[in-house]
């Protein structure tokens, strides 16, 4: 399974949305109905699943699904 699909599955499960809604352009708050606590819990789930650390200052810059995919791609092997 490709990285995007893995991330898509985690996001869909955490936010209780259909995976089809989780597109690279989908914004967590505006499009997927997440509140600030949902976003924090999602970041923690992604950190655990993919073995990356997403510092708060980076998490604040992650607005949509594409942002988180890029961050994990760039930092997963670091």
UniProtKB/Swiss-Prot annotation:
GO molecular function: acyl binding; acyl carrier activity; phosphopantetheine binding
Post-translational modifications: 4'-phosphopantetheine is transferred from CoA to a specific serine of apo-ACP by AcpS. This modification is essential for activity because fatty acids are bound in thioester linkage to the sulfhydryl of the prosthetic group.
Localization terms from the record: Cytoplasm
Matching SMART domains: PKS_PP
UniProt domain Carrier: residue ranges: 1-76
Keywords associated with the record: Cytoplasm, Fatty acid biosynthesis, Fatty acid metabolism, Lipid biosynthesis, Lipid metabolism, Phosphopantetheine, Phosphoprotein
One of the Pfam families matching this protein, by short name: PP-binding
GO-annotated biological processes: lipid A biosynthetic process
Pathway noted in the entry: Lipid metabolism; fatty acid biosynthesis
UniProt KW Oxidoreductase keyword: no
Modified positions (O-(pantetheine 4'-phosphoryl)serine) in chain numbering: 36
Principal location listed in the UniProt entry: cytoplasm
One GO cellular component, as annotated: cytosol
PROSITE patterns tied to this protein: CARRIER, PHOSPHOPANTETHEINE
Family the entry assigns: Belongs to the acyl carrier protein (ACP) family.
Biological function: Carrier of the growing fatty acid chain in fatty acid biosynthesis.
HAMAP family tied to this protein: Acyl_carrier
The protein's name: Acyl carrier protein
Organism: Helicobacter pylori (strain G27)
């Amino acid at each position: 399974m490709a990285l995007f699909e893995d991330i898509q599955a985690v996001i869909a499960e955490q936010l209780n949305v259909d995976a089809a809604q989780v597109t690279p352009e989908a914004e967590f708050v505006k499009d997927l109905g997440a509140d600030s606590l949902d976003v924090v819990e999602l970041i923690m789930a992604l950190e655990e699943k993919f073995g990356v650390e997403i510092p708060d200052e980076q998490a604040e810059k992650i607005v949509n699904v594409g942002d988180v995919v890029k961050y994990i791609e760039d930092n997963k092997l670091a």
